[in-house]
Amino acid sequence: LALTIYLQFLSPNALLTQGQALPHPTVFANALFMAGDNTPTPMMVQYLGLKAKAGDCLLFYRMGDFFELFFDDARAAAATLDIALTSRGEHDGKPIPMCGVPVHAAEGYLARLIKAGHRVAIAEQTESPDQAKARVGKTLVTRDIVRFVTAGTLTEDSLLDSWASNMLVAVAPVGEFFGIAAADISTGYFELVTVTGGALEAELARLSASELVVPDGFAELPGAILRPRADFDSVVGGDVLRQHFALNTLDSIGPITRAEQAAAGGLISYLAHAGQGKMPFLKLPVRREVHEHLLIDQATRDSLEINSASKGGRTGSLLAEVDRTITGAGARQLAADLAAPLMDKAKIDARLSLVQWFHDAPLTRDAVRAALRQLPDIARALGRVVAGRGSPRDLGQIRDGLDAARALRERLGAMADRPELLDQLLPALDGHGHIVDLLARALVTSPPTDTTQGGYIAEGYDAALDMLRVAGRDGRQAIAQLEARYRDMTGISALKIRHNAVLGYFVEVPAKHGDALMAAGTGFTHRQTMAGAVRFNSPELHEEAVRITQAGGHALAAEAAHLEELMALILSRRDPIATSADALARIDVSAALAERAAQSNWCRPNFVAHPCLEIEGGRHPVVESALAKSGDRFIANDCKLSPEKRLWLVSGPNMGGKSTFLRQNALIVLLAQAGSYVPATSARLGLVDRLFSRVGASDNLARGRSTFMVEMVETAAILAQATERSFVILDEVGRGTSTYDGLAIAWAVVEGIHETNRCRCLFATHYHELTRLADSLDALSLHHVRAKEYKGDLVLLHELADGPADRSYGIAVAKLAGLPPQVVARASAVLAKLEKGRVETGGLAAGLGDLPLFSAAIDAAEAKVDALREKLTDLDIDALSPRAALDLLYELKRAAGET
């Protein structure tokens, strides 16, 4: 019944084909859909059963040397991979779409499919054709799904970015809390955290998940993979954790919450499903608390371009500008540091002290960075080994990495005045001498990835293996001698002994000499006739071929056995090896930050207890670097926020540098709490618990939000979440609507930040009227970016000065941008009239200075000239008699009631 339903689901009208057949054998595909009476063949039944198991994943169905895809999977894959869509067999009289990729090149195709958002199920042959034939009455090779390849479960180098972590994240709602379990299985990193709804978005933004898994029915995170709710049961999750890590109690992890147990259970269950029973490497999970790091929501990350630029990609981001790491592990650690700056002053200072140690010792720094260049990616090689996807090359990388770590340990251990953090890291680089020495003896210098051809176990490691190899070499030498003898014997100089996977060894002669060797008594047996050649066998050749094959087979088996032993050794030492990889990454990051600081004369920030932000000579690292490439100099500016003056209102012309000033101070805070030097002459600050940026605007049409709506949503989040220890930058709040509405909103937001949130804030605006708030808000300070006009042209100085801007220079900026002269002239005339009207009537600013804090909006009716007011205005009180006055009073009261 299920098969019938599935076949009906595959609409015949939709099965259209195009393109040419791929150049590979078609016998398997023809066998799949060959029944003329529309009855599915056994192979079709097998395929459809596996497809049902694969669900919404594309099914890579192994057929010989190719992975084949059929029906809708074929159409989707062909479109994504830009490969030919062909057809094999029929269903309901219509050709069935098919495409395929070679097994040996599958990783490249998988990478493109995963990047396009697909998930792939790999169905491999689980027995050989000979094994299938040995089963009575069955010749169909058994296949099964051996792995699901998804964005969050990748371990192969070709499918991963070496500089970026690859996070799989599971979220479990339990009561009012959300448990988050996050893992990078390529390195074994595993963390748990519990958050409330208000911090969920910021935590997910920090983790930047490649794949998100949630329980079925949880609709708050669109795009997440839905998994059975039973996988997210907190009791089951606790049992799963204990079983996976062989723990008697979860106390060794820490005070783990029910929400974290539920999320961990969901994540581990998904990994078991993806690996079809083969579990990847997971370290014992690290418990995190939300208050341990600076909270940054997604809007702020996008605005500040922390890990990626606004146009996508790494170029132009803060990470790209700061990153001077040598190793992939170091690059990933730096990205993690910038994504989650610390809130612990002691830990920040420990990082800064190590950076300073490298900064102040350039020769040591250069030597360490040179040593790091010899390091392979130990963490990811270890991850593949633990996941059962390791190769001899991975073992070689672990060997070389641990050997380099040992040498680095000796060098750094001999240095004087080491900082405390370095002393904590160095012991992790020791203790692997036995592994390094064993792998050095066992493996060749550059082991291959492919094991099918052997050659990765070094000579001298196993005497028996060496003898098998000698036998194979002797056999090949004997065949070369046999070839020379056959040439002399037959007189055919073009005779050759060749080898292929189908025939093995054979004698080949040009077609014109074929008859001579076919004659009786020659000792040759005909094997194959080609267009231009004839192939033969001989008893002597067969005997040598058997010897070579047997020796080669035994040698491959011996190498495989040694490889398994070496893999088991690495598995037994996986935790200390992973710890070494982490230590090397931290050393790389520290030396890299020191290098970056030395390149641009950055300074070490100083943290104090009270909430201040005192920056002298602050610069925007990305903008400064871009200007330097064109030979221009960045204008540094100071910022001094204190409890007494914690809110700066910054005005001035467009292009004057307001947004850059705002962003550079936010980036300085972020870098400082990440443990980095900062682009400034000096920096003194109190810890920031939340960082908010409302700079720039864009539509979110997919979610039905205009530019102004996006601005208001982000501003609302800031007003709701910012605390007294937060740092907020706001740029042009209210510009997306009418002048009156925008000014009113900006006015109220400034008051709210000042009176309710009471946080450190930089607020840039073009509303000159806001400067009147300085008269009523004690902690507000006025500043502006300087500009001047010279011979009719605007000169932007990019310097910050005290006090409000005298005017906005908007028309001058428009002229600078190239607006037509007649448009600029007309704008100047209109502006003159508007400013004259404002002077005469009080205009836009009339009465604003008298507004009390948080006053209710003035009723729109009061702004209108109504009938009641007109009547009172026209009234001549002296001309009224007492009776007329009384009647008028009743009339006015009645009119007021109707109003």
Per-range role (PLM):
Residues L7-L10, P25:
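Short hydrophobic targeting helices and cationic amphipathic motifs
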Residues V865-T899:
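C-terminal tails and terminal domains of large nucleic-acid-associated
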Residues F66-S87, G179, Y189-E191, E211, ...:
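A conserved P-loop NTPase coupling/switch region
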Residues F71-D72, T257, I326, A336, ...:
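ATPase nucleotide-binding head domains, primarily ABC-like/P-loop NTPase cores
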Residues T26-D360, D377-G383, A387, T445, ...:
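Basic, polar low-complexity surface loops/patches
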Residues E211-V213, G266-L295, T300, S310-K311, ...:
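Structured, non-catalytic alpha/beta "coupling" segments that mediate domain-domain communication
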Residues D400-Q477, Q481, K496-E543, A585-L649, ...:
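Amphipathic heptad-repeat alpha-helical coiled-coil/stalk segments that mediate oligomerization
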Residues V171, I180, A262, G266-I268, ...:
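SMC-family hinge/dimerization module
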